[in-house]
């Protein structure tokens, strides 16, 4: 770098070289920034492509069984294999049940995709969490009775929170469904609220088998199933907990799971309303 103050030709040349050097440095910096951005774009494209391939593979795998069953039973009806009304009714029930499972999975996938891509942002409002939970329990009353579940939720005072009421209802519903589907032993479900000045923690406990510690973190991954046979039996898709995680991420709040004595606990936190 030229540091002189001469006004002759050497001085002018030196100052010109300084200016050129600064411009070159600035241009190189811009090129590095552009290159970094391009690299990020390439990595993001690769990530999206891999996610797309994984998504297609998973969806294809999940749809394979219900489509095969629907096709098989439909062909059975067409070929007259169900000769009596009782058999025909059974064939139709299987077809309707499998179609319902596919419909449920597609709806869950649409919900999850919208959440993951930020197209379904939470609409924040103040509401009573206790009223919401009681509403979910009331809606699930018949299912709980069919499972022979004992449900304990003794919160009586309102607990006001700040969140998207519709989405939190979906979180509670998914946790409750998960508890019902993995209920065992005493068949007890407990919902507990722990509140401090800033947050409330909601915990849903169910008696049943523990999950291997190495599998706990995978539960939030879409299509992941610890017990595939059992999940298939109750019509699960392995998407419900992924939706929970996406909803809590959109609220910038935490959720988790842990093994406890005689069962499992799933939890999430919300901001208390001022």
Residue ranges and their predicted role:
Residues 1-56, 74-78, 93, 222, ...:
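Membrane-proximal HAMP signal-relay module
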Residues 3-5, 123-128, 145, 150-159:
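Conserved catalytic submotifs in the C-terminal HATPase_c
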Residues 4, 93, 157-162, 166, ...:
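A short, conserved loop immediately preceding a beta-strand within the C-terminal catalytic
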Residues 29, 97-105:
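Short alpha-helical segment of the dimerization/phosphotransfer core of two-component systems
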Residues 117-122, 160-163:
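Conserved micro-motifs of the catalytic ATP-binding
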Residues 179-180:
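Short helix-loop "hinge" at the ATP-lid/N-box region of the Bergerat-fold HATPase_c
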Residues 186-198:
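Short beta-strand/loop element within the Bergerat-fold HATPase_c
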Residues 211-225:
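Short conserved segment of the HATPase_c
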């Amino acid at each position: 770098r030229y540091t002189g103050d001469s006004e002759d030709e050497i001085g002018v040349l030196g100052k010109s070289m300084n200016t050129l050097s600064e411009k070159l440095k600035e241009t190189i910096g811009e090129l590095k920034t552009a290159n970094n951005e391009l690299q990020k774009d390439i990595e993001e494209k690769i990530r999206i492509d891999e996610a797309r391939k994984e998504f297609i593979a998973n969806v294809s795998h999940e749809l394979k069984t219900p489509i095969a069953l629907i096709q098989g039973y439909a062909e059975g009806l067409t070929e007259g294999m169900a000769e009596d009304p009782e058999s025909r009714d059974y064939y139709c029930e299987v077809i309707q049940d499998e179609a319902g499972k596919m419909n449920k999975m597609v709806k869950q996938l649409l919900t999850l995709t919208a959440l993951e891509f930020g197209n379904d942002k939470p609409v924040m409002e103040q509401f009573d969490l206790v009223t919401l939970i009681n509403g979910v329990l009331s809606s699930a009353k018949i299912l709980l009775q069919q499972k022979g579940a004992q449900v304990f939720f003794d919160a009586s005072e309102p607990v006001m929170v700040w969140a998207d009421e519709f989405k939190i209802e979906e979180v509670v519903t998914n946790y409750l469904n998960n508890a019902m589907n993995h209920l065992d032993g005493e068949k007890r479900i407990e919902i507990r609220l722990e509140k401090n000045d800033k947050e409330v923690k909601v915990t849903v406990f169910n008696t049943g088998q523990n999950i291997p510690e190495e599998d706990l973190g995978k539960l939030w991954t879409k299509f992941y199933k610890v017990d595939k046979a059992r999940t298939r039996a109750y019509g699960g898709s392995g998407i419900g907990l992924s939706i929970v995680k996406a909803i809590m991420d959109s609220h910038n709040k935490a959720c988790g799971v842990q093994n406890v004595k005689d069962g499992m606990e799933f939890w999430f936190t919300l901001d208390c309303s001022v």
